[in-house]
C-alpha cells in the first residue's frame, strides 16, 4: 500500500493536479476563503474526480503548520527512483541529454528552487546522493511550484560510481568550483551534459570534483566570492540553453 504524504500551497497542489491527479487521495480546502486561484483549483479537482473537503482555517492548520494558502492535499508518495531509472531515461533521449547533479544539498528551499529551475530549462533528471542530502519534502514541493511532480528526482547510493557510469554512457560531467580557471561559457555544453553543483558552503566534495571532466566557474564582478547553489543552478542551466539555441555559425 502506498504511503500518504501531505503537500500544501497553491503551486504545489496545482502541480500534482496537472501531472498526476490520481495521486491525490483527499483535498482539504479552507472554507469561505476569497481567493480566485483557490476556487479554480477546487473546480479543477472536482472535474478530475478528486474528493474535496471543506475545513475551517483552524482545522486546516492542524493538518499543516506551514503557510498552506488555504489548501492541503493528502497524496500517495511518488515511487522513489534509483540508478536503474537513469538508463531508461538516457535510452529514450532524442536530443542531447541535460542532467543536474546535486552533491549534498541539504536545504529544502535550495532543492526546491533547483528543481524549479531544472524543470524550466528542460533537465531530464535531477540526481542526488541518498545520504547527507535532503530529499523531496513538503517544503521542497511548495518551493518547487509543481516542478517536483514533473522532473524525475533520482537518489543514488554512490554518487562517484554514478558519475563514472554516466561518463561511460557518453555524458560529459561539468562541475562548478570557485577556483576553476575556465568560465562556464567557455565550455561546449551542446552535447550530453551533466551539471554538478556542490553543497551549501562546502561546494563539491573532493571525490566528486576529481571525477568531473571539466571544472567551471561563474564569472562574478562584485565583491562576493560565491553564489547560493540555487542561483548558480539557474545561471548554469541558462548557459546550457543559450548555447543549444544559438544560431549555427554561417
From Swiss-Prot:
This is 23S rRNA (guanosine-2'-O-)-methyltransferase RlmB. HAMAP family: 23SrRNA_methyltr_B. Its main location: cytoplasm. The keyword Nuclease does not apply. Its EC number is 2.1.1.185. InterPro entries: 23S_rRNA_MeTrfase_RlmB (IPR024915), Alpha/beta_knot_MTases (IPR029028), Ribosomal_eL30-like_sf (IPR029064), rRNA_MeTrfase_TrmH (IPR004441), SpoU_MeTrfase (IPR001537), SpoU_subst-bd (IPR013123), tRNA_m1G_MTases_N (IPR029026). GO terms for cellular component: cytosol. Belongs to the class IV-like SAM-binding methyltransferase superfamily. RNA methyltransferase TrmH family. RlmB subfamily. SMART domains: SpoU_sub_bind (SM00967). S-adenosyl-L-methionine binds at residues 198, 218, 227. It is found in: Cytoplasm. The gene is rlmB. GO terms for molecular function: RNA binding; rRNA (guanosine-2'-O-)-methyltransferase activity.
